[in-house]
Amino acid sequence: MDIRKVKKLIELLEESGIDELEIREGEESVRISRHSKTAAQPVYAQAPAFAAPVAAPAPAAAAPAAAAAESAPAAPKLNGNVVRSPMVGTFYRAASPTSANFVEVGQSVKKGDILCIVEAMKMMNHIEAEVSGTIESILVENGQPVEFDQPLFTIV
């Protein structure tokens, strides 16, 4: 397993509400946890150096939760059907940098139409319209990181 993959896993763990993550690739495995356990050690020698700082920012995780709670009252202002991110990842409006965007504001969409891509761990996940309607707003900029359940679009 490549150290870059381990670093990406740590970043995803920090960005999400997950407390522990274990990945197995063939005979190799790595376990990353927000809470240190002396019995469970990652296979990689470098991994503990990266896993230890993850436990330290745990109190800081309360601050984004408080910020999310403060911004929660703004959520009811969204009109129509709100399409939310099903995962933590990176938001892309098009299949590639040279491709046209999947949708634009004011465009009509049908249930099942692809609205965007959320990339998570090098996997491109198509996000589809849950209802038919018109794109009222696009709430995220292309290439920006998104959180689980973050609003991406409104469809009216």
Swiss-Prot record:
Listed InterPro entries: AcCoA_biotinCC, Biotin_BS, Biotin_Carboxyl_Carrier/Decarb, Biotin_lipoyl, Single_hybrid_motif
GO biological process: fatty acid biosynthetic process
Protein's pathway: Lipid metabolism; fatty acid biosynthesis
Residue positions, PTM N6-biotinyllysine: 122
CDD domains tied to this protein: biotinyl_domain
Subunit description: Homodimer.
Protein name: Biotin carboxyl carrier protein of acetyl-CoA carboxylase
Domain Biotinyl-binding: 80-156
Key words of the record: Biotin, Fatty acid biosynthesis, Fatty acid metabolism, Lipid biosynthesis, Lipid metabolism
Cellular component, GO, one term: acetyl-CoA carboxylase complex
Pfam families: Biotin_lipoyl
Transmembrane stretches, start-end: none
